């Protein structure tokens, strides 16, 4: 039995929960939270790893490899979108009459376990903003729970099971998964032309964000400078507070200054009064918006401006968000999750401002549909670095599309380098990078492995 419709008593009626693919970063926070709430958790995965080791230390019974025996005696089975429909454990659960639930649906149930669920949405900036809000609440002693799309060093992982009343959740719009949540407070950072292979049009994408906003129980926080976001907000009969730089939001960054190359500070104006000063410890003008969202939510939740400023000053970034890996031939090697042209532009412009002699970008295009649909935008943005190294497209969930290739992309970018593998990309950097360069790997696939190869000789 696949659980899709909401049943408010679902988690009241189960005790033993089994997670297929328990080593995944998306599963781990849910396992932490449910284990802390007293559920008997088991799991399985095909490979060992740091997450599985952490789960075992928590007392979770983890089996390496999938077997029908793993689900015997459990009350519910959780699976992610990455699990094949013919998975032996999923089929066994079906034959035994054990309810099965997809990870994003379970996350919706988990969001209802807390008095205040703070759900952060937007095409860009979700992980950073979710991490900033979690950092602020954590440093303020609120002990929040969290489910984040990247690793936050402060909490040593992708989430945590706190004892407080708050849970901070990264709300992803892919395949409408954020519509399974029940936000008490919600954030809409921006709405951009991504996942149109699923939605079909910007109109449908904006309608999904409208539905998400309408599900918010108390207050919506929206980016006043993002036209698509405000197009949605103007159609709502809901309580909305806004933040921005250019427009007069309820929370506004004024007197914005670059205190060192690529790093910004600003005065926080709440309505008509400057209430404090915020200095960011992460580079990039785009992070001002993420910090404003954090300030807006946390001020509403009862934190002081000083506590927000402390969080901004102490937050050094989340995993795979302009994360420094080390050096290669004296060049600094950084990895970033950017995979949409808007994100690439923000990240590359930030990198340009840092004062390095050359910027080398190693980009792994992600999905054929996105690469084809936004081809001209990718071409334009990949002209920003001094050298663009292009790897093969990572198709992920999509079948191969011979009409779109990395070679076609590279052919439109003067001076670009086309490689056939991550290993070849790393080798090219090892042979050509030099002191004074900044090398940045870009993409939401496994491009980070190339960064690790580049710095391996220096570790």
Q: How should these model regions be labeled?
A:
Residues 8-10, 33-39, 53-56, 70, ...:
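Phosphate-binding loop of NTP-binding sites
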Residues 1-13, 67, 107-109, 323-324, ...:
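A short, basic/flexible loop-to-alpha-helix module at the beginning of a structural domain
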Residues 56-72:
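Glycine-rich, highly charged phosphate/nucleotide-binding loops
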Residues 17-22, 442:
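Conserved N-terminal Rossmann-fold NAD(P)-binding element of oxidoreductases
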Residues 379-435:
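C-terminal helical cap/extension that packs against the catalytic core
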Residues 2-3, 10-18, 26, 33-37, ...:
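Nucleotide phosphate-binding/pyrophosphate-handling subdomain across enzymes
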Residues 39-46, 219-224, 360-364, 385-395:
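Short internal beta-strands
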Residues 44-45, 63-66, 101-108, 147, ...:
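Beta-strand->loop->alpha-helix junctions that form or flank phosphate-binding loops
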């Amino acid at each position: 039995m696949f659980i899709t419709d909401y049943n408010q008593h679902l988690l009241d009626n189960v005790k033993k929960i089994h997670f297929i693919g328990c080593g995944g970063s998306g599963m781990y926070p849910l396992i932490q939270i449910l284990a802390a709430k007293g559920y008997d958790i088991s799991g399985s995965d095909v490979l060992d790893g740091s997450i599985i080791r952490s789960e075992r230390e928590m007392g979770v019974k983890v089996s390496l490899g999938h077997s029908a025996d793993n689900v015997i005696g459990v009350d519910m089975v959780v699976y992610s979108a990455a699990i094949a429909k013919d998975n032996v454990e999923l089929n066994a659960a079906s034959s035994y009459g054990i309810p099965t639930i997809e990870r994003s649906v379970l996350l919706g149930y988990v969001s209802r376990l807390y008095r205040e669920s703070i759900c952060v949405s937007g095409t860009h900036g979700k992980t950073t903003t979710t991490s900033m809000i979690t950092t602020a609440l954590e440093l303020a002693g609120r002990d929040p729970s969290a489910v984040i799309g990247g690793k936050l060093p402060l909490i040593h992982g992708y989430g945590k099971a706190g004892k407080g009343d708050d849970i901070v959740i990264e709300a992803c719009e892919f395949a409408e998964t954020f519509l399974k949540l029940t936000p008490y407070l919600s954030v809409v950072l921006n709405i951009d032309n991504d996942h149109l292979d699923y939605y079909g049009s910007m109109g449908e994408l904006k309608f999904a964000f409208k539905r998400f906003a309408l599900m918010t129980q108390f207050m919506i926080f929206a980016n006043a400078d993002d036209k698509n976001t405000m197009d949605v907000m103007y159609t709502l009969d809901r309580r909305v507070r806004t933040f921005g730089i250019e427009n007069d939001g309820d929370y506004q960054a004024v007197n914005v200054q670059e205190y060192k190359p690529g790093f910004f500070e600003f005065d926080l104006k709440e309505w008509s009064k400057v209430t404090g000063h915020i200095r960011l410890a992460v580079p990039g003008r785009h992070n001002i918006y993420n910090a404003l969202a954090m300030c807006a939510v946390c001020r509403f939740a009862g934190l002081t401006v000083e506590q927000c400023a402390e969080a901004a000053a102490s937050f050094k970034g989340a995993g795979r968000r302009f994360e420094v890996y080390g050096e290669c031939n004296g060049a600094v090697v950084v990895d970033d999750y950017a995979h949409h042209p808007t994100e690439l532009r923000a990240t590359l412009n930030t990198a340009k401002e840092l004062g390095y002699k050359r910027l080398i970008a190693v980009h792994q295009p992600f999905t054929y549909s996105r690469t084809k649909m936004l081809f001209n935008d990718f071409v334009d943005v990949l002209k920003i670095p001094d050298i663009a190294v292009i790897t093969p497209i990572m198709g992920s969930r999509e079948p191969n599309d011979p009409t779109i290739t990395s070679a076609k992309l590279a052919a439109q970018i003067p001076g670009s380098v086309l490689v056939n593998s991550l290993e070849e990309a790393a080798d090219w950097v090892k042979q050509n990078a030099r002191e004074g360069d900044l090398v940045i790997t870009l993409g939401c696939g496994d491009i980070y492995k190339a960064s690790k190869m580049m710095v391996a000789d220096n570790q």
